[in-house]
Design a protein with these regions (language model features):
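Function-determining sites in protein domains
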Residues: 6-11, 20-176
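Short, Lys/Arg-rich N-terminal segment immediately upstream of the first membrane anchor
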Residues: 1-5
């Protein structure tokens, strides 16, 4: 009888643990959109930094369909790691669901994971892929430490994107 009681207790414990795990998974933030869907590079946002590398705001440029394809091809060659301890310093891409846009590009497999990184407080129909070497930012008394998808050697990637989109030239024009 004791052995039967232990088996029942074990089964009850396993079921209870499974129920707790299911409840935790249910509260985990889920992406709004299907990760296997088709996305586009809608715009490239890039940081306008002050003389002391203080955040002044960001600018954006709208890539042509050809430039967007070139950008996605560039990204596939970079090592990607998840990071939660730094903010981007220079630029990020906005990826929007193509159902709202006319230009469509297929999201690379490695990039599909990036759309799971989202802010549950801001459930807009887009996901930011953050690129570049980063640092913590303090603005208006708040420290910004959101998770983002970091690209190794972000400065090199910035230079390659600059060759496509002429980001530095645009920033210089705006500063003049």
């Amino acid at each position: 009888m004791k052995k039967k009681g232990k088996i029942i207790l074990t089964v009850v414990l396993v079921v209870a643990i499974a129920a707790v795990a299911a409840a935790v998974a249910a509260f985990r933030p889920q992406p709004v959109l299907d990760p296997a869907g088709t996305y586009e590079v809608q715009r490239v946002n890039y940081w306008l930094e002050g003389p002391n590398l203080e955040w002044e705001g960001y600018l954006h440029t709208m890539p042509t369909p050809e430039q967007a394809q070139e950008i996605l091809a560039l990204l596939e060659g970079y090592e990607k790691t998840l990071s939660a301890d730094r903010l981007p310093q220079r630029l990020f891409l906005n990826l929007l669901p193509a159902q709202f846009q006319s230009m469509e590009v297929q999201l690379p497999e490695w990039l599909e994971a990036a759309i799971f990184i989202w802010d549950p407080e801001n459930q807009d129909d887009y996901f930011n892929l953050i690129l570049g070497d980063g640092h913590v930012q303090i603005r208006d008394g708040y420290t910004y430490l959101p998770p983002y998808y970091e690209i190794s050697n972000g400065q090199q990637l910035y230079q390659e994107l600059d060759a496509i989109l002429h980001l530095d030239q645009r920033m210089a024009e705006l500063r003049d």
